[in-house]
């Protein structure tokens, strides 16, 4: 059949080209003429269509359109009868296809005729490639969509779907938003977010859609009444912005035209394409109140609209899409009447219309995309705006199919893309070629009928698609090379196997044939050779033509998914004779890569070894793929992915094919979807998770990416990795022995015995096969426990597991810590840690040991005072605790001292000799290793087996901050500010590291590691009480804070606790404890920076606080942020401290404090959204390190209550006593008509609450610029006290003052006073 179409095309291509150009009618009935015209037809698009792939080209283009339109429903309805006759009609298809006149339209037209007369013929007509191509070109947009989507049962059954499949491949590739619809379509598959799942349902890729403008009124302080979902950062990959839900009582609900699932293309003429979710939200928030114009793509039928109660929204969407009530009528379900009324509905003529576009004015053409219906498929004109260029021209009509715009064929373009082309045409003549029936009434009627059919198809498409013949669906799906999303949808829908195959087949064939087309070129390159590759990598084809080629690395996973479809492929093969050879190749490829994908990694179980997984992946037909639906498949994918990520695994392939996270996510998701299909209906839930697995691995290591729970992902990934890799690493590396303590040592000294003991203790089946690297952890990853920190502390204190552990690990651990202690490797370790963190996604067995070693060395180096890693860890921990208690509140100082005393005792115990220290040291070292995410996980497991004190939660918490440390280095700013920020970021990163190590060390009972300097005569006295207080504090401790001045003192050599007051002593202990956590390299840098600071900057350190909050995973920090570089360039400050939040309980962070960094991420120069993102990311870890700066005004705000000048003066003096930074100055300024030359902020009832009135900005050109400075607090104005006044009232006071000299009493920080006092006195 295909050769038939090709030969006809080649013979008559020239002739028909000229004919088509002259708008000659073609008789679709004559199979010979039809075929040749059809083929000739493609000739105009010959570049893409030649090779009999013309159909592919068109189909792919149309597929994209179909995607948007979601037209597959119509094809299903139209082709229902045809599908039954597919086999018989197969021979006739080529002939009927030839009937198609010029392009997709001609093909669709012929299909209509055929369908009208002999349904068998129409279906067959759809199948022949030449026909298919035309069908695709005309209906492919519909067919590919339907075939790939909801209408699989019917549309796929018909031959048209096969033609469209190539189109679908192209289209899928073309429109990511449409692709999104596909994966979403499968409700069976659990989506990562409810919104996405809903979107998927709404987006049902087979539905027809229209683009329309909706005008909504935005009130002040009010939204538009709907929420959005999607964006280029979606877990499904780059997609458009969709309406998630519409709120009752909102503007959108009142308007009634916008409906859930609509894609928002433009806002007030600004494209929403390529925006992240946050950017889109910001656009809506920044939109000014008033009328907003939304350009939306509305599906004529959405799954909800299938229900009777949803039909009204459908009508609304139709009307809105048409931008007029008239539109709804043409598309209403009732309007469709059989276009068969016309004698020859398949006839088509090509008309070229040139419209003159004016600058800033659109053409007024309303577009819609509908699925294949008889002779209707593609992108059509559904309405003309009254008074528009197109309307006044009068040559375009409703029902015209768009064929070319500016000499560019649109068959392979999606509805969104065609709309973009039309809306962005340059001013001047815009040539548009349309295809229509000679009788415009027929074209319009056909369009109405197609829309109605699409609506009906949506209603019944899902069921049909589930119940339709599997063989037909498979054939069609195999013909349709759908993107990953499509595949996922199909998988989720009833026919997963054949879908995967269809996707593979189509994508490969399409890609090979579509090389000429923008979307298909990549596919064309690799389509032919990919058959084998595809077998290996079913995913790649689904991802995209380009991806198909690269998927080879990911082949192992895909084969598993696709293996079950093999029988289906065989069935398809029986049908394929009707189809092109391409389809055969595709089918074969599909089967090879059709193995079901593993279930969600969260539920990952290592039932099969990684090798088995790999083998299964390689073997498409291997029954293991089917037998191991969840555990084996998941392990197969997870382990190979983790192991092969470095070697260009599926992720690399995906990235190469589709640059950007979207492509990779789509690929993985599609693969998962396919595997799930084959495996079972339940498996679909895993697809979403599996792609996330890859992401998580990467995200876990970069703290910035915390969209998902890093620990859950890391633990899952690590389990997979560790079972094969980590065990090997542990056995090979001493670090891991330290890390896992019992495990490592046992593994090295007596691997079997130690491991078995640990396993038995934990009661978790841990099989460590270092040699195989296929270690399988049957038990789920140890989940972090909210109270792990407190529990570990209590357990350490009360329990004597140290002696137990020492016997097991002592010999092995002691030597390793010593070797790791050397400071030389430490700096490298710190840098390597960061690098490794950033590349955690690529971690491997070899890397893990290195990381562990580096981690260990780092910790020892950070604790310079102690040579042994164990001691250092303990010291750090105790120091941190001590610091927290000391800094957080003065009343905690005693607790800190007692803690320090307790720690000294423990340290003394360890200090006496290495032999004693090794047991504790071993634990500390293990914890030290734990900072590395992989190591932590391992140690967690081992620790869990060992005892509750050693439970992994602490390690996990530690590992999380490690990722943050990288970001800590971030931005160094100008002069003083930059220095302060750099120091704060270094400290926060160091504290994060220390915290990571801290919980483990505490749990291990390594509190003893405290610098000897810290140990004071007082400390021994408070040992027992300190231990209790410490344990209790840890149990109920929400966090602690520490003043940077304390660290400065320590770094300057003021480390002797006895030199200063108790407060100073406590602070020095705190500083020492924090500094002990730093590596030698980091400490040296910090000291150098502190030494370079001038006195003024050093004084500012007193107002900078490092606050460490201990919290549950997912819990907020208890405060909100205000300000940002995009909001009047204001610094990020604490907007509000929630009464019962962590920050409020800890007490250091106050409203108005400037936030310098969070978890090592500097907020200097950050926009408000960036700051909020960083704050949200801080939810995931169990600890949060916040560096804040408290202004003197804030520090002394409580004292500013008096309203008279005397009271204010006294208050100022009191403040100066408490805070050495503030002084009162009297300044005389000259008042002019322009005022005093400065602006005010604060005052009673300000945005930040009741604040003192301060000078916000000095106006340029004012002489008093040197007299006053921003930040000065205004106490009096010409003898009038302004305390307690609002800013408005204060301005009224200033305005009432006469022109001339005005005496002002201000309060200024000591840093500013030196510069201003002299001028003020003079």
From Swiss-Prot:
Residues 104-147, 480-633, 651-695, 729-963 are annotated as: Disordered. Isoform 1 is expressed in neurons of the cerebellum and hippocampus. Isoform 2 is expressed in thymus, spleen and lung. Its main location: secreted. Residues 729-741, 856-865, 896-907 have a biased composition (Polar residues). It is found in: Secreted. GO terms for biological process: induction of positive chemotaxis; leukocyte chemotaxis; positive regulation of inflammatory response; positive regulation of interleukin-1 alpha production; positive regulation of interleukin-12 production; positive regulation of interleukin-6 production; regulation of calcium ion transport. GO terms for molecular function: CD4 receptor binding; cytokine activity. InterPro entries: IL-16, IL-16-like, PDZ, PDZ_sf. Residues 1099-1195 are annotated as: Interaction with PPP1R12A, PPP1R12B and PPP1R12C. This is Pro-interleukin-16. It comes from Mus musculus (Mouse).
